[in-house]
From Swiss-Prot:
Domain of life the protein comes from: Bacteria
Protein name: Dihydroorotate dehydrogenase (quinone)
HAMAP family (alphabetical): DHO_dh_type2 (MF_00225)
Function: Catalyzes the conversion of dihydroorotate to orotate with quinone as electron acceptor.
Active site: S192
Broad enzyme group: oxidoreductase
């Protein structure tokens, strides 16, 4: 059996001790990916080598959604490449699509550090990043000089912290107009727990003007989705679905991180010495899996399977992917699982999907 250099050699070093800063490690990895994103012969060759190592291509994995071709149904979730510095690299790791951002109209530093915490025994992460990003103009500049992507690229839009809730629609609109030519689909993020008041925008009276404003400016028409929180009640989700259908949105991303902390094994966060319950922020990873899947199933049932769903939350194994697809997800996304398992996870998941497809295909 071949040794995975990330999982068996690099990851134990990165995750060892209490000195490792998860955010610094993320920045270093993203800087490397940004360098690989250059339109230079060496970088192109290295991307090709990564693709041979990590990617898996098979016609049975392909999906057609919103008129876009997805080489496979597994994408990179928003939050990893906030500024769009590595657009052409994500396909080399095997992703079938990538969602950039969250990006805001105004550049902003995010919340004070520390703001990213690993809960190893739970295979989870708590983050309170606060939409730290260089702004929509900087993302546009990065994408305009980047080599083209071979997979669909989504862009996740958030509200700037300095923008009052009453002016949220104008803030989203400014980013949407600037980035519209550069994304294949767009996601309205009103569900992060780390921007004060943002989740209030999920209420009907707050959300409707945002959806109306963005759809009115959506020319030529591109898929516009909404990302929702897992902590909503079924009644709240049903009300959101009414708006999604009324304003003809293309789909739902389910779900964002949770503010719940029930059932965690981790007692203390090493960086702060406090318990997970005492740390503000959104929880992602394995503890979110069941709730995210339940939300996907509810949306699928409420819409009779007519609304495409991107399922995200707690994917670590092929069975996790299959569970979300069976619940009604059209596509799925990774974030925390990829951090813990490393780049080889994509290939494992895709092999698992193919194995499941083989089992479903009757012998001739």
């Amino acid at each position: 059996m071949a040794i995975d250099p990330y999982r068996h050699l690099l990851r134990p070093l990165l995750f060892s001790g209490l000195q490792a800063d998860p955010e610094l490690l993320h920045q270093q990895f993203l800087s490397l990916c940004g360098w690989l994103n250059q339109d230079r012969s060496l970088c192109t060759w290295l991307r090709q080598q990564l693709q041979q190592w990590y990617a898996l291509s098979d016609p049975r994995l392909e999906r057609q959604v919103w008129g876009l071709r997805f080489p496979n149904p597994i994408g990179l979730a928003a939050g990893f490449d906030k500024n769009g510095v590595a657009r052409s690299v994500w396909s080399a790791f095997g992703f079938g699509f990538a969602e950039l951002g969250t990006v805001t109209w105004h550049p902003q530093p995010g919340n004070p550090r520390p703001r990213l915490f690993r809960l190893g025994s739970d295979r989870a992460v708590i983050n309170r990043m606060g939409f730290n990003n260089a702004g929509a103009e900087a993302m546009a500049a990065s994408l305009e000089r980047s080599p083209p992507a071979s997979i669909p690229i989504g862009i996740n839009l958030g509200k700037s912290k300095i923008t009052p809730l009453a002016a949220a629609k104008e803030d989203y609109l400014a980013s949407f107009r600037r980035l519209h030519p550069l994304g294949d689909y767009f996601v309205i993020n009103v569900s992060s727990p780390n921007t004060p008041g943002l989740r209030d925008l999920q209420a009907k009276e707050q959300l409707a003007p945002i959806l109306e404003t963005l759809q009115s400016a959506n020319h030529p028409r591109k898929p516009l989705l909404l990302k929702i929180a897992p902590d909503l009640s079924w009644e709240q989700i049903a009300a959101i679905l009414d708006l999604v259908q009324a304003y003809e949105l293309a789909g739902i991303v389910a779900t964002n991180t949770t503010v719940a902390r029930e059932g965690l094994k981790s007692q203390t966060i090493p960086q702060t010495g406090r318990s997970p319950a005492e740390e503000a922020g959104g929880l992602s990873g394995a503890p979110l899996r069941q709730r995210a899947t339940a939300v996907i199933r509810f949306i699928h049932e409420q819409t009779q399977g007519t609304l495409p769903i991107i399922g995200v939350g707690g994917i670590f194994t092929p069975e996790d992917v299959i569970e979300k697809l069976a619940a009604g997800a059209t596509l799925v996304q990774l974030y925390t699982g990829w951090i813990y398992q490393g780049p080889s996870l994509l290939r494992e998941l895709l092999k698992g999907l193919l194995a499941a497809a083989d089992q479903e295909t009757p012998e001739k």
